[in-house]
Structures are given as C-alpha cells and as structure tokens.
C-alpha cells in the first residue's frame, strides 16, 4: 500500500512555508485545495506544484457535502479542476462523482481520475451498488470513505473491497472506514485490496487517520518476511 499525506494550506503564505522535506516518507501528496478561498486556489497552485515538483500529487477539492471545506457550483468545480489539470498535470484528480454526476461527462478526457464518494455520517447499506457504479466507469482509482459506527461496518467494507478487487483485478481501489473503530481498515489495505492508505503529519484530513511515522512502522512490520 502507498501512504498518502494531505497538505492543507489556508493561504499563499502557508503554502510557501511548507517544508517539503517533512513529507519525504509519504509516497503521494494530496493537495486539499478546499481549505483555500475559491478565488485563491489558482494563485496558490504554482507554489504547491513547485514545492512538490517530482512527487506524485493528487489534486482534491473536497466540498462540504462530502466533508470538505468549500462550496462550489458545478460550473466552478469543473472550471477549477480543468484549469489545474491543464496548467499543472497532477498525477491524480479527485472527482466527487455523486455530488457532480451531472457534469461528469466533461471529465471523460481525463485519464487520471480518482472517482470518490465520502459519507461522514454512516456506512450506507448500498455500498455494493456504489462500488459497482464507480467501477463500471473505469477510473484510475475508485475511492470510498465512509463512517464506521460498528465493527460490522468495518468488516462489510473490507469484504466488499476484497470482492470487487478479486472480480476487477486491474482496477485500483481506495476504501476507508473512518472513525476510531475504522482505524484497522487503514492498516489492512494490502489484505483487502486497497491501494492507498491516508496518514497524517500535523493535521488529520479525516477521522481516524494514523500518523505517517506510525503507518511507516506498521508497513515495515507487515512487509517483513
């Protein structure tokens, strides 16, 4: 599993002050641009992409409806994604499929989509349908993060992930059970068939995240012969 760490600057000054060397243990950097005012995102972008030049990077605009910090109309959402994609060619672009399904057709030319679904309230009963619909669209990655309230919620998502990965071995998945009870899902990625696990450096970007240092140690232990 690859370890992903998010950067969440709230201003150009914070972006410029980021110390990229602190993120060397991360395999991929996620830029959570939703922590900025929408009019500042394109102004801050050069600093982020220069700071992490040569690193794999995910561009993410996590909207409030899916647990993020920004509200965007479909037109604003698509415009910002397309501008960043065309100017900086991030390795991955997160797209909130269920929040912006009506404009998804405008993203069909982008081969590096992470089609995502986030539910900070529950693990919905229709998880299989969600995973199936996202898988059929054949994105670079399918990402699902849902809140776990019981151990069964966690086991269900792990089992669904393993099943879908077995049936679709070429498709990459990232599935996460959020919250304290869901922490175990963050360290079992290799078993369930999830490609990434999100870790934290200073500030968590989702409930239940484990520190990068701890995740690195856990991965080393799991990789031992």
Swiss-Prot record:
Active site: 118 (proton donor/acceptor), 143 (schiff-base intermediate with substrate)
Name listed for the protein in its UniProt record: 3-dehydroquinate dehydratase
One Pfam short name: DHquinase_I
Molecular-function GO terms, alphabetical: 3-dehydroquinate dehydratase activity
Catalytic activity: 3-dehydroquinate = 3-dehydroshikimate + H2O
Alphabetized SUPFAM superfamilies for the sequence: Aldolase (SSF51569)
Job of this protein: Involved in the third step of the chorismate pathway, which leads to the biosynthesis of aromatic amino acids. Catalyzes the cis-dehydration of 3-dehydroquinate (DHQ) and introduces the first double bond of the aromatic ring to yield 3-dehydroshikimate.
Keywords of this entry: Amino-acid biosynthesis, Aromatic amino acid biosynthesis, Lyase, Schiff base
Top-rank lineage group of the source organism: Bacteria
Pathway named in the protein's UniProt entry: Metabolic intermediate biosynthesis; chorismate biosynthesis; chorismate from D-erythrose 4-phosphate and phosphoenolpyruvate: step 3/7
PANTHER family: 3-DEHYDROQUINATE DEHYDRATASE
Protein family membership: Belongs to the type-I 3-dehydroquinase family.
Subunit record text: Homodimer.
EC number(s) reported in the record: 4.2.1.10
GO annotation terms (biological process): 3,4-dihydroxybenzoate biosynthetic process; amino acid biosynthetic process; aromatic amino acid family biosynthetic process; chorismate biosynthetic process
Residues annotated to bind 3-dehydroquinate: 6, 30-32, 62, 186, 205, 209
Keyword Amino-acid biosynthesis attributed: yes
């Amino acid at each position: 599993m690859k370890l992903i760490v998010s950067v969440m600057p709230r201003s150009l000054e914070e972006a410029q002050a980021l110390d990229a060397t602190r993120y060397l243990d991360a395999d991929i950097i996620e830029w959570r641009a939703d922590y900025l005012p929408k009019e500042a995102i394109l102004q801050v972008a050069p600093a982020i992409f220069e700071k992490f030049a040569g690193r794999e990077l995910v561009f993410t605009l996590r909207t409030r409806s899916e647990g993020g910090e920004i509200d965007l109309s479909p037109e604003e959402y698509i415009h910002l994604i397309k501008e960043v994609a065309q100017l900086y060619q991030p390795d991955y672009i997160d797209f909130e499929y269920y929040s912006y399904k009506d404009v998804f057709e405008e993203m069909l030319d982008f081969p590096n989509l992470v089609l995502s679904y986030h539910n900070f309230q529950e693990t919905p009963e229709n998880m299989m349908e969600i995973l199936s619909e996202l898988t059929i669209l054949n994105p670079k990655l399918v990402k699902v993060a849902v809140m776990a309230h019981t151990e069964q919620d966690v086991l269900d998502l792990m089992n669904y992930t393993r099943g879908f990965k077995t049936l679709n071995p070429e498709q990459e998945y990232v599935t996460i059970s959020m919250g304290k009870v869901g922490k175990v899902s963050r360290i079992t990625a290799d078993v369930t068939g999830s490609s990434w696990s999100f870790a934290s450096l200073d500030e968590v970007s989702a409930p239940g995240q484990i520190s990068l240092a701890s995740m690195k140690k856990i991965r080393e232990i799991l990789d031992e012969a």
